């Protein structure tokens, strides 16, 4: 069979175009396809929600790929093992309450299962603003990451979502944008994004699940973003809290949409 280069191009453009149009109005839009964001998306999709994710980088997975200092092993605690088991990620006991998993297997497996659950992931797209109606966040303003990097003057497009989840990690990008540009008050003690604190694994893992919740009308936070918004510590290369955080937000949104 002779291959037609133009037909290959047409197939890619038509398929992506249709996928993007379908993503312009969804139940939940998640910014950041790290472990917390993907876990949140997976459990929402399993509940029948229409979910789309936007990841500014070429690859998904956030900082999980590199484990600790590029040693591609990651640690989970006992209470997160059930999530690993559900995804089919192999883990092994290091000592009581400390489980190890291969970081590459973990990211690739979670990503695969998330997409197969029905989630659409768009990489190389950044959220540069939020859409607000009646003091509630109800969508995202999107542009290619390459436009931002090249500092080109190119207008973005907008999509609508019943709920938006900020899973952008340490930067808490969506929450900071909402605070800075809209004047929406965050549900923190200061009404603002407080910024993450220095390393303390135990406290960070305990607070990350507690802090994963609605931070402004229509906007939820999960993963390291939650601790950045609420001023809690970072936790380093232990990832149980990330998965538990994403699952919690998925359940809260599902309960709200019932």
Describe the predicted segments one by one:
Residues 32-36:
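Glycine-rich Rossmann-fold phosphate-binding loop(s) that bind the pyrophosphate
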Residues 88-163, 167, 173:
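Feature captures the FAD/FMN-dependent oxidoreductase FAD-binding
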Residues 1-28, 143-144, 192, 197-201, ...:
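Extreme N-terminal leader/targeting segments of oxidoreductases
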Residues 4-6, 56-80:
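Conserved N-terminal glycine-rich FAD pyrophosphate-binding loop of Rossmann-like flavoproteins
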Residues 29, 45-65:
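Glycine-rich FAD pyrophosphate-binding loop
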Residues 154, 170-198:
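Glycine-rich beta-alpha-beta "Rossmann" dinucleotide-binding loop(s) and their flanking helix/strand
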Residues 43, 73-94:
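Conserved FAD-binding subdomain of flavin-dependent enzymes
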Residues 229-257:
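A conserved FAD-binding loop/helix module that cradles the flavin
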């Amino acid at each position: 069979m002779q291959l037609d280069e133009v037909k290959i191009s047409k197939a890619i453009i038509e398929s992506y175009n249709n996928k993007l149009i379908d993503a312009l109005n969804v139940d939940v839009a998640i910014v950041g396809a790290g472990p917390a964001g993907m876990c949140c998306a997976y459990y929402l999709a399993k509940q029948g929600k229409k979910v789309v994710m936007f990841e500014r980088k070429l690859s998904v997975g956030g900082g999980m790929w590199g484990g600790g200092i590029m040693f591609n092993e990651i640690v989970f605690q006992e209470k997160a093992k059930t999530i690993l088991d559900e995804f089919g990620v192999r883990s092994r006991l290091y000592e009581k309450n400390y489980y190890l998993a291969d970081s590459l297997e973990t990211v690739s497996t979670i990503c695969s299962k998330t997409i197969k659950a029905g989630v659409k992931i768009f990489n190389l797209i950044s959220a540069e603003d939020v859409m607000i109606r009646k003091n509630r966040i109800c969508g995202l303003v999107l542009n290619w990451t390459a436009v931002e990097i090249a500092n080109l003057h190119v207008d973005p497009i907008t999509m609508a979502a019943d709920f938006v989840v900020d899973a952008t990690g340490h930067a808490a990008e969506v929450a900071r944008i909402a605070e800075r540009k809209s004047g929406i008050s965050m549900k923190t003690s200061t009404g603002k994004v407080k910024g993450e604190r220095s390393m303390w694994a135990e406290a960070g893992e305990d607070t990350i699940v507690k802090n994963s919740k609605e931070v402004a009308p229509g906007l939820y936070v999960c993963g390291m973003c939650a601790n950045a918004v609420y001023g809690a510590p970072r936790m380093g290369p232990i990832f149980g809290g990330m998965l538990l955080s994403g699952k919690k937000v998925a359940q809260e949104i599902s309960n709200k949409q019932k």
